[in-house]
Amino acid sequence: MTASLHIILDTDPGIDDAAAIAAALFAPQLDLQLITTVAGNVSVEKTTRNALQLLHFWNSDIPLAQGAATPLLRPLRDAAYVHGESGMEGYDFVDHQRQPLAKPAFIAIRDVLMNAPEPMTLVAIGPLTNIALLLMHYPECACNIRRLVLMGGSAGRGNFTPNAEFNIAVDPEAAALVFRSGLEIVMCGLDVTNQAMLSPDFLNKLPALNRTGKMLHSLFNHYRSGSMRTGVRMHDLCAIAWLVRPELFTLQSCFVAVETQGEYTAGTTVVDIEGRLGQPANAQVALALDVDGFRQWVAEVFAYAP
């Protein structure tokens, strides 16, 4: 199968990010052109190190650029309590000498977009700081973005505060800017990612699959978004799954606003499912997932990896 969709992946690895990066690299329908890192699950120095370790593990020459170390206006609040202090606890990666590109992520994204023969798809599975910086500094790049597919937000409950999902809550100002940008947005939030569970039976089969399966199994043993006994949630993998198997998702066009001011509600995505606010839709919001189909696709894409 010929790769047909050229993508840029913005990420904050992160254990479920590792699974998403594997899918982005090895799904035959995708052509990953650039990886950029952002502070989120852990510091940007750690997310960059983790992404470089993964690229070395897979012997991949995909370029990588380090991005924002802090949110636009706030101090970083990370998720080391979910992913471990390093962000990818549980596997001993081999030492390497790889380095990121000598330019920040938003400039690297700009360069790839402006040199592409046709608009590209951005995939953001961490806080939206780098995407906001791109749009702030180079608004002309929007014409070269086919769409933005993101993991973030929720039409209901949060996982970082009672109402806010982690990626949006870390940098709500960046998210608000992105949702106001006019980009075509597909939002894969907690409404679907909480359904994206890999079962214990699935997890137990990973080590026999290949080197990647062994590595991911080791990481999942240290992942605190679920457990090996009850299953683990693959939040970030949903964004990649939508690119390849959009029929697995039920989407609805909605107006989405990001709250930036509330003492208890900052980072909340206000998803106007019923159109009560009278605002035009600015996102396609995923509200349901074919879980069995998702698991089947994950098994297929992991099998493509070495």
From Swiss-Prot:
Gene name as annotated: rihC
Family affiliation: Belongs to the IUNH family. RihC subfamily.
Disulphide bridges: none
Protein name: Non-specific ribonucleoside hydrolase RihC
Active site positions, chain numbering: 235
Pfam families: IU_nuc_hydro (PF01156)
Keywords: Glycosidase, Hydrolase
Gene Ontology terms: biological process: purine nucleobase metabolic process; purine nucleoside catabolic process; pyrimidine nucleobase metabolic process
PANTHER family: INOSINE-URIDINE PREFERRING NUCLEOSIDE HYDROLASE (PTHR12304), NON-SPECIFIC RIBONUCLEOSIDE HYDROLASE RIHC (PTHR12304:SF15)
Enzyme Commission no: 3.2.-.-
Function: Hydrolyzes both purine and pyrimidine ribonucleosides with a broad-substrate specificity.
Keyword Nucleus: no
Keyword Hydrolase found: yes
